[in-house]
């Protein structure tokens, strides 16, 4: 019943090729100039799209995100915040080491995404690869200094970011950035060394690192 009232088009893929290539097809299917990312189990603030479209048009931005508030079970009980830089120069510098965007808050211009090569098979880092490619293609970026989404976090998120396989894929993605000249060798080596510690530590330690060291309490 709800499905019939909402003009959502589905484009099922015949074969699971991973998130990056699925997002690539999604971009190609979009019919409008501005595309919004959203995760199914997250909650956008009611005026998220209005605020983002207005700022994108006012400042002629190609890529715009914002901050997130994280919860475990109850969206009204926020446990942490992930705040990101808001100005283009800060974003460009920050993106070389960590993601300068919360992907579930992002809006971007379709033509700039295509100019940057669209999403690729990202080895768990399809968003970071696209952000760097868009910056290299001349995209003007920004982040709203506001909470745009409430995001569910839990043990599953921390488990996915650990283990030898994750570390291997992370290193391969960073190598791709290095070969493209988007990061320096020192940035590559430093990020892989840090990720090695995080990926190989016990799950509860990884959760502590993410929630207490890489997040804000307010």
Task: For every predicted segment, state its role.
Residues 1-12:
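Acidic donor-binding segment of Leloir-type glycosyltransferases
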Residues 47-80:
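Conserved donor NDP-sugar-binding/catalytic core segment of glycosyltransferases
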Residues 67, 141-148:
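Catalytic beta-strand/loop signature of glycosyltransferases that borders the donor
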Residues 67, 81-99:
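Short, flexible, basic/aromatic active-site loop/helix in glycosyltransferases
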Residues 124-130:
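Acidic donor-binding loop at a coil-to-helix junction in glycosyltransferase catalytic cores
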Residues 139, 151, 159-184:
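Catalytic core of nucleotide-sugar-dependent glycosyltransferases
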